[in-house]
């Protein structure tokens, strides 16, 4: 009995090793793309255009596009939302009182940029693959789906922008902020020492 159990385990081991090795290679190349955000987003834009051309050329799979749009809207909301929602923060009264202007809270996203990009790219690839199976081509009147998605997008983004204004946060930053000392006091201080 022990011999037969060991044989089945050893049969799966080479397969598991190959799968694990393939996963490591995949993860290696995925990690190499991390610092190249512009190139990653250009690649995702290419996937998006290929998907749009596919749907446009076959005039179908609108329900897949609608589901993809809802999923991308969900990802966008996660990307624009802070990790800790100020409305849900519970203060138990044990903290020291501080003024809002004195306290610095960096904006930390609920969904980081890399995971946002990765999920979005996977969604485009999966949706593209689904267009090759006719079972997913459900006949629908696409203008109704488009109107419903636009209304959903506008209402959701209005709520998100109101939340940003209410809690005074901006989810976008371009580059690293550069801080410099007060130059006027440094110049005046240097001039007073020359006596």
From Swiss-Prot:
Q: Where in the cell is it found?
A: Membrane
What keywords appear on the UniProt entry? Acetylation, Membrane, Transmembrane, Transmembrane helix
The reply on keyword Disulfide bond is no
Q: Give TM segment ranges.
A: 38-55, 60-80, 114-134, 135-155
Instruction: List the InterPro entries.
Output: Rer1
Cited Pfam families: Rer1
For this chain, the family text in UniProt reads: Belongs to the RER1 family.
Q: What is this protein called?
A: Protein RER1B
| Biological source species | Arabidopsis thaliana (Mouse-ear cress)
């Amino acid at each position: 009995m022990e011999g037969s159990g060991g044989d089945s385990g050893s049969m799966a081991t080479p397969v598991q090793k190959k799968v694990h090795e393939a996963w490591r290679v995949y993860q290696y190349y995925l990690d190499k793309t991390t610092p190249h955000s512009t190139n990653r987003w250009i690649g995702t834009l290419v996937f998006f255009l290929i998907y749009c051309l596919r749907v446009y050329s076959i005039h179908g799979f609108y329900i897949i596009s609608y589901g993809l749009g809802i999923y991308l809207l969900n990802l966008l909301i996660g990307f624009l939302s802070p990790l800790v929602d100020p409305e849900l923060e519970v203060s138990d009264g044990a903290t020291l009182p501080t003024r809002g202007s004195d306290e610095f809270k960096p904006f930390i996203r609920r969904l980081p940029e890399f995971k946002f990009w990765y999920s979005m790219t996977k969604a485009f690839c999966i949706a593209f693959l689904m267009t090759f199976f006719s079972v997913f081509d459900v006949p629908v009147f696409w203008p109704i789906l488009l109107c419903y998605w636009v209304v959903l997008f506008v209402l959701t983004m209005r709520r998100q922008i109101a939340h940003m204004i209410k809690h005074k946060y901006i989810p976008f930053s371009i580059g690293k902020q550069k801080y410099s000392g007060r130059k006027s006091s440094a110049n005046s201080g240097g001039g007073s020492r020359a006596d």
